[in-house]
Design a protein with these regions (language model features):
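Bacterial N-terminal signal peptides
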Residues: 7-13
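C-terminal motif of bacterial Sec signal peptides marking the signal peptidase cleavage site
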Residues: 15-17
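N-terminal pre-domain segments of enzymes
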Residues: 21-68
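Trp- and acidic/polar-enriched beta-sheet ligand-binding modules for extracellular glycan
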Residues: 22-42, 80, 106-112, 134-221
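Predominantly extracellular/luminal regions of secreted and cell-surface proteins
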Residues: 60-96
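A short beta-strand element within beta-rich, extracytoplasmic domains
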Residues: 77, 123-134, 199
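Extended extracellular/luminal ectodomain segments enriched in beta-structured repeat modules
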Residues: 111, 119-126, 194-195
Length: 221
């Protein structure tokens, strides 16, 4: 009887873990509803920039664990620039990817960051970022980091870094610069655990502006 009871308890302990493992093992395409009102701004291409990934003409298929959902909708956003030049920080998580004024927030020139508080730690699947809708906007020193520490002093994981000369002070990045588009940038969350997502930039190859249209954080709650 004791052996049977022990086996039953062991089974009950293992089952939730198995369910979670099965859920994470099955991968499905990430669902993103892209803006249908995207405008391609007629900016001239910047000069003297390193090789970069050109703007895609169609959305990428990115696989994530089954059960992944949008975690960042309506979540609070803070920034190294508490008083943006244009717009308000809540535009970053309002679910609106449309281009143009009234849809983006613009920070001061120079190195800046925005930070999303998910409310609690979660297992991250993907982070999607839209600065602007333009094939000739190539943002500089883009770094995406995750932590459970709101001050990012400990337990920090870097998921993306294209700061090739380490000028941002966050380490030398190996990711490529990329051109903006209505399909944004999808960063692999790698199953990292974290509550806070911080995104850095240092203007773009054309000007000093730091604009953010939308950020989506997808994961397993």
């Amino acid at each position: 009887m004791k052996i049977l009871s022990f086996a039953l308890c062991l089974t009950l302990l293992i089952l939730p873990s198995c369910r979670k493992s099965n859920r994470e093992a099955k991968r499905i395409p990430l669902e993103i509803t892209y803006s249908q009102h995207a405008v391609i701004y007629e900016y001239p291409p910047p000069k003297d920039i390193p090789p970069y990934v050109h703007a895609p003409t169609e959305p990428a298929v990115f696989m994530v664990p089954n059960g992944t959902r949008l975690l960042s909708a309506g979540k609070p956003v803070t920034s190294s620039d508490p008083e943006p030049i244009i717009g308000s920080l809540d535009l970053i998580t309002d679910g609106d990817q449309d281009p143009g004024e009234g849809h983006y927030v613009e920070l001061l020139g120079g190195p800046h960051w925005v930070q999303i508080d998910l409310g609690r730690s979660a297992t991250l699947s993907a982070i999607c970022l839209w600065h602007e809708h333009s094939p000739y906007r190539i943002y500089q020193d883009v770094v995406v980091r995750v932590s459970n520490d709101p001050d990012f002093r400990s337990g920090v994981t870097t998921l993306f870094n294209n700061d090739g000369d380490a000028s941002s002070g966050l380490g030398k990045g190996t990711d490529s610069p990329y051109a903006e588009s209505r399909f944004g940038l999808i960063v692999d969350g790698r199953g990292v655990q974290g509550r806070y997502v911080r995104l850095h930039s240092n203007g773009n190859a054309s000007n000093i502006h730091n604009r953010y249209t939308e950020v989506e954080v997808h994961g397993l709650p």
